[in-house]
């Protein structure tokens, strides 16, 4: 199992709990994530877990909670080019949610419960290369809130605890 994190900040607490886990800092955004995954040379036996913080639309997902993304869509593409990536089965016992991958703050959810900046790249690469993709996100904020209101530390700590549970179960 390989754990991908967009930033060192998101990975730090997990590294402290699981120092022997394979952690890769993929970079922020779809391009950086796709390039990082391509450099790993994944095969069908690999499981890549994309981990990080995310924003929630509305009140359906609580700040501080940890979820598994089971459906991901890049909503910034014109509608006729959009593809929804669906997970056939959840990988974890976490609540499954639908997510949008965005590069700019989207105040419209398009039916998603959360947003992030890397997930669609993970699932596109999984389709192309045949590895198992899992996306686990901790909710740090409500979409549209200013950064000073985000609960990054709380979210990163909650994420690390859930990932440790996943690591211990493998």
Question: Locations of the language-model features?
Answer:
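Glycine-rich phosphate- or other oxyanion-binding loops that anchor nucleotides, phosphorylated ligands
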Residues: 2, 7-170
